[in-house]
Regions:
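Single conserved hydrophobic/aromatic residue that forms the stacking wall/gate
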Residues: 1-6, 196-204
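AAA+ P-loop NTPase catalytic core and its hallmark functional loops
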Residues: 7-194
Length: 204
C-alpha cells in the first residue's frame, strides 16, 4: 500500500474518520482495531497531516521496555567532563509537546510495560516521572491513539501469534474503540478509480 501524505485515497472509511477526528477535536483516546493491512495507522497519519498536527508512531513490540518509554540515565559531556544525566524517553517528551502519539501493535506490548501508559489514558492525567521526582502536565494539544489487530481479548483467529490479552481496566480507559477492516469490493473499486479515472467505479 502506498499513500502520500494528504492523499485522498487513504481516507475511505467514514466511521473511522469520525472516530479519529473526535480524538483530535475533543481530546479523546482512540483505539483503532482491525485486520493487518487495512490502513489503521495510515488513516491516523493522513488525518493528522490534514490538521497539520505532528504525528509520531511507536511500534509497541515485545522488545519495547519501560526504559525505552520513560527514559534512562545517560553519560554526557558537559564542560569537558563526563556527567550522568537523565534522558527522557518518548513518552515524557510527547506528553509535553503538541503531538499525536500513536502506539502501533498495541496488543503486542509486554504486560508489565503496558501499565506505564495507564495514567496518560486519562485526558487530563498528569505523568509522574519518578526518576526526576517530577510531575509532568499534559500539553493541551497532546493526543494519544493506538492500533491493534485484536480487541484486547487475545488472538482467537490464529492469525496474530504473539499478541497479548490486555488488562480490561486499561481497555476501559480508551474513550473510543473503532474497527477498520477490509473494504468491500465496491469501495476498493471506488478507491482505485479515484487515482485511475479511466476505470469504472463499480464492478460489472
Amino acid at each position: 500500500r502506498s499513500c502520500l501524505v494528504g492523499s485522498e485515497m487513504c481516507i475511505r472509511d467514514r466511521d473511522t474518520t469520525i472516530a479519529i477526528l473526535s480524538g483530535f477535536s475533543f481530546n479523546k483516546r482512540v483505539l483503532v482495531q482491525g485486520y493487518h493491512g487495512t490502513g489503521k495507522s495510515t488513516h491516523i497519519e493522513q488525518i493528522a497531516a490534514r490538521l497539520n498536527w505532528p504525528c509520531i508512531r511507536v511500534n509497541l513490540d515485545s522488545h519495547i521496555s519501560r526504559i525505552d518509554l520513560i527514559g534512562k540515565d545517560a553519560i554526557k559531556l558537559k564542560d569537558g567532563k563526563q556527567i550522568t544525566e537523565f534522558q527522557e524517553g518518548i513518552l515524557p517528551w510527547s506528553i509535553q509537546n503538541p503531538v499525536a502519539l500513536v502506539f502501533d501493535e498495541y496488543d503486542a506490548g509486554r504486560p508489565d510495560v503496558m501499565f506505564v501508559i495507564q495514567r496518560i489514558l486519562e485526558s487530563e492525567g498528569n505523568f509522574t516521572l519518578l526518576d526526576k521526582n517530577k510531575v509532568i502536565k499534559q500539553n493541551k494539544y497532546f493526543r494519544l491513539f493506538a492500533t491493534s489487530n485484536t480487541v484486547g481479548l487475545g488472538d482467537t483467529s490464529g492469525l496474530y501469534h504473539g499478541t497479548q490479552q490486555i488488562n480490561q481496566g486499561q481497555m476501559d480507559r480508551w474513550n473510543i474503540v473503532t474497527t477498520l477492516n477490509y473494504l468491500s469490493l465496491e469501495k476498493e473499486m471506488e478507491t482505485v478509480s479515484y487515482t485511475h479515472l479511466t476505470l469504472p467505479t463499480s464492478p460489472k
